[in-house]
Amino acid sequence: KVFKVFDDQDSGNICFGTEKDGERYFIKFAGAPTAEYNGTLEDAVTRLKSSLPVYENLKHKNLIEFVEAKEINGGFAMVFKWVDGDCMGRMYPAEHRRFMNLPFTDRLNVFGDILDFLDYTNSSGYTAVDFYDGSIMYDAENHKTTICDVDFFRKQPCVNDMGRMWGSSKFQSPEEYQLGADIDEITNVYCAGAFAFALFG
């Protein structure tokens, strides 16, 4: 049973909240047209498939729990455990307002969870790419931070092979605009600082 649809993504993925046997899941699917995506379905499928090793390799208490991946009718689906909470990202204005109106101590805890996750990411041999406010959820009732999107994280060593890399400009370091530049733990430190400004600025 589908109880929620997210079809306004610019990534080429369409996402669903589903329920089966009393358990809720979040499904990310590439291979169908979405309202905001201008690329090809093939590219969307390729990108989602390339994120599979990231979710298989990174296991952290604040990272959304990966369940399985499937090829379906020429498309590709990734299944995660559903989590409740508000998204920090401005693309969901009502949730963003609730998030930014959290008590200072809650926002401080979110920031601590982000720092811990970035430290874990680096120690696991990955660099955060396209990590921004839309990647963060918070369940105020249970005081739980969830990182819900690490699709574009890169295995180290990583070099900028795009010029303008994926991501929100508010959270991107200078090297994420410079073709051939190293993308490393310094990039993650810049990202952490950007989150501090976003949460407390």
Where in the sequence are the language-model features?
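Conserved activation segment of eukaryotic-like protein kinases, specifically the C-terminal portion
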Residues: 161-176
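Catalytic-loop of the protein kinase fold
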Residues: 118-139
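ATP-binding glycine-rich loop module of kinase domains
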Residues: 11-54
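Activation segment signature within eukaryotic-like protein kinase domains
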Residues: 110-111
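Conserved HxN/HPN-centered segment at the entrance to the catalytic loop
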Residues: 58-69
